[in-house]
Amino acid sequence: MKLTPASILEAPVYYADHIHGKYDVDKVVILRDCGYVSENEIMPQTLKLLPERTNIVDFTNNELEELPPLGHNDTVHTLLLSRNRLGRLDASRLPRYLVNLNLAMNRFEKFEQLQGLRSAPKTLKNLNLRGNVICHKEQYRETVIALCPQLAVLDGERVRQAERQAAPQNEKTDTPTEGPQPVALQATSEKELQLMDHVVNKMDKDTLEDIKQQLAKATTLAEIERLEKLLSGGVIQ
């Protein structure tokens, strides 16, 4: 489904306290669970119709293969894109003053797919990549931190000074060399993604619906991430 002007006009909008701990501060536009796909004809102009001073855009659980083109936007500080089909990161599409970016449970498998982080807004402090195959790579955290040294939090864990010191420091910020992915590893990656779907499908209908309702009513990033982790088969802590 294409994102149209009508989609924006009809999207739920509410105020929440996701970031600042104060009520009625952040304006949230909900575009989740609609099957939106990436395209470059209508979407760029459509996203310019977001309500004035939108702070959080929720594109969770769609069919996006590219970041939504929000490079023109200077009020969005949080972009929720978990459970899409994203496999590359074009930083020119990110909001100018983005602080929080949730890319959990997408299709990032290789460090090359994250090279765009080099050009991410300097305001980006919180990045979530949990549920992507790349999270299991050797030196994953150190490499991501090297690509985006301004990060303060990665996958819900504060970036430690020891991790910054261990990150590649040469002028090109080299990432671990990766050759062609072995067939066995490709199969493993596909199985991991299938397992996520399998876990969700095994939930009884009432439980799944209850979690989705809680997710729709969640008012903090921590609560959203907790419920999304449950949907992906993770353990609630």
UniProtKB/Swiss-Prot annotation:
LRR repeats, residue ranges: 53-74, 75-95, 97-118
Domain of life: Eukaryota
Cellular component aspect of the GO annotation: Prp19 complex; U2 snRNP; U2-type prespliceosome
GO biological process: mRNA splicing, via spliceosome
Record-linked SUPFAM superfamilies: L domain-like
Location of the region described as Disordered in the Swiss-Prot/TrEMBL record: 161-182
UniProt main location, coarse: nucleus
Residues covered by the LRRCT domain: 132-170
Pfam (any one): LRR_9
UniProt keywords, alphabetically: Leucine-rich repeat, mRNA processing, mRNA splicing, Nucleus, Repeat, Spliceosome
UniProt cross-references to InterPro entries, sorted A to Z: LRR_dom_sf, RU2A
Disulfide bridge positions per record: none
GO molecular function, one term: U2 snRNA binding
Cell compartments where the protein resides: Nucleus
Reported function: Involved in pre-mRNA splicing.
Family stated for the protein in its record: Belongs to the U2 small nuclear ribonucleoprotein A family.
Subunit-structure text: Associated with the spliceosome.
Protein name as it appears in the record: U2 small nuclear ribonucleoprotein A'
Gene source species: Eremothecium gossypii (strain ATCC 10895 / CBS 109.51 / FGSC 9923 / NRRL Y-1056) (Yeast)
Lineage, broadest ranks: Eukaryota, Fungi, Dikarya, Ascomycota, Saccharomycotina
